[in-house]
Amino acid sequence: MNYAECLELARGKMGNYCKVCPECNGRACKNQMPGPGAKGIGDTAIRNYDKWKDIRVQMDTLVEKRPIDTSLSLFGKNFQYPFFAGPVGAVNMHYGDSLNDVSYNDILVSSCAEFGIAAFTGDGMDSNVMVAATEAIKKAGGLGIPTVKPWNVAMIREKMALVKDAGAFAAAMDIDAAGLPFLKNFNPPAGSKSVEELREIVKAAGVPFIVKGIMTVKGALKAKEAGAAAIVVSNHGGRVLDQCPATAEVLEEIAEAVDGSMKIFVDGGIRSGTDVFKALALGADAVIIARPFVTAVYGGGREGVEAYIQKIGSELADTMAMCGVSSLAEITRDCVRV
């Protein structure tokens, strides 16, 4: 199975919200929520995609021919590629009821672990979303990253107990989910967190903690102050606020400010191995891709996930070879033209 075949099969299994576009660029679903779209007109998701395409790679084949090494070491784990599947919760509501969170997470987490990467998993209003996610990670020997919504600190502590029971090697919180409509009137109050609250959450996790939803240098430095091991430069896939800059536009300045003191992930509109290369050149340590993994699972299950990982991985390796680098460490700023 290749990814194109996977997309064709997914069209018959997904609901009305996701259009299963050949190129997932945010245009067809831009204002649909529930679904993969945004609460506004969706221009941030579209900008995310477009800005990666504005960056060009610097081809250089006057180099010694060497084996290409795409491997990444992160938090004591070794991965075949520097990209991860992104967190998605309540899949039956957003993408169609041929799968639920239990079946989706079982396929995604186990397949990612089998084929050399790891999956971030989602959270939701239904507490069973997080339960299903952490159970899938436990079955995979802890090779997954459970991602909690920014609930109140007491509720997050309860969810961190699930993380510990799963043996997850890291945990995350998508702080930008504060902009999701269903969190606005949640009781007890959920949403944005102070540095002090974040520090308490980081301590409760007991494993390397990743703060997802950082779009400014100021935000990155506050996450560092709170003790985060990593950040994700992210605007929640453009879902939570229109008129934001693209992640590609802010990544480099954030990476320069962090200066290696935390690991940096980036997401938002990354749709090829060449995009992954660009992100690493601008200072990211790794990349997160979400929506295309959903269609991979719906369209092909385990084989679909394998096909998508191989697609992105082979594109990355080819770009590295054509740009004269043989390891991730060699992908530097001069490899791209912005």
Positions of predicted regions on the chain:
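Long, hydrophobic, well-ordered secondary-structure blocks that form the structural core
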Residues: 118, 129-155
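Charged C-terminal helix
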Residues: 314-338
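An N-cap/entry alpha-helix motif that binds or orients negatively charged groups
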Residues: 2-80, 331
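Alpha/beta enzyme core
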Residues: 109-110, 139, 151-266, 273-297, ...
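Generic structural signal for well-ordered, non-membrane alpha-helical segments
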Residues: 37-41, 45, 101, 105, ...
